[in-house]
Amino acid sequence: LVEVYKEQAKVICEAGADLFVVETMMSLQECRAAVIAIREVCDLPIMVSLTYNEDGRTLYGTDPATAVIVLQSLGADAVGLNCSTGPEAMIDPVQQMAEYATIPLLAKPNAGMPELCDGVTVYRTTPEEFASVGAKLVEAGAAIIGGCCGTTPEHICALKQAVGSMPVHMPLTKKRRMLASERMHVEIRLDGKFMVIGERINPTGKKKLQAELKEGSLSMVRTMATEQEENGAQILDINMGMNGIDEKQMMLDAIYEVTSTVDLPLCIDSSHVDIIEAALRIYPGRALVNSISLEKEKIEYLLPIAKKYGAMFILLPLSDEGLPKDSAEKHGIIREILRRAEAIGMGKEDIVVDGLVATIGANPKAALECFETFSFCKNEMELPTVCGLSTFRSDFRSAPMSTRHFSQWRSEMALRWRLQILPRNF
């Protein structure tokens, strides 16, 4: 689909267009394909407009807030809605978008719902009624306004008179940390509650899952996705890393199966840059990349890929030299990755920092160092953090740990409890 849109975009751009308007769209995935295609051809402004049903969602189930979150992260210059309903029904969707929009919003309603009279399609909303509701749309947050089906020059003239002197709504200047699937979104807040990333969809150590994947079956993947959603996961990690399969194709197949089974946003997890890129290209939402370190391949190639596809990423404080020797080195890596991200237009709102958990049995100070990282990220860097609890859990099962070590860790947890995301094995 991207290639089809690229062919059109290339011709339109060469013909001298000033901007692109992708409108009356019913699928968020098609919107993504169009924006990606245009951005791969030129840098002209892009406006994207979807059409919504009476239930406030597109035909494929996307709500207004999710649409603006995904499309503005992908690089759209304005997002909104057109057609489908009369102007009154557009007020609430515009308000929903305005809560998250960092780009201008547009609204182009019909002149009411169409009626068939004596074989002729008729729109009942008068220019005066249309203009009156148009002012409410501007108050709701629309910065660009117009008309769609059934509107006439008289409707647009009345609209201009009604809204011409109204102040233009300015989008939010502070971004929010948002992830999204095609049908829902979640926010990662520094002052918010714990969030859970379900990480069971990973063949490592799971012989039954490995055998099934080698047979080309994703039945267990679907079951694991459903079980984790039912048990409270808010984000699902997808990892297909194992020998004996086409990992890239299996990742793409798994994403399709999981997004068809549950609504949760996904975390794309692979050690291969090309696999993450392929996954981000087809994922119908805003994903979390697991992960980007200061290693050359990750920082030079994967970071721009995350930017291109509008993804957030987990910052892993590692470098080509391996594990940091101490907290100071770890802090330096975090600062440098943030600097590199900001240099290409990303920011703190696009990042979650991995605490880099080591096993307590091997290093009794591991938990304290981990919590020190959490404290540094939250209090000095204003960055949320992520912690792999399976490391602690397996350590408790297999390695002896003294009461003193456990008490020290427990006390530290009580003092520094504000992790923001807690990956967990269900």
Describe each PLM feature range.
Residues L1-D354, A358-F426:
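Domain-level signal for soluble alpha/beta catalytic cores
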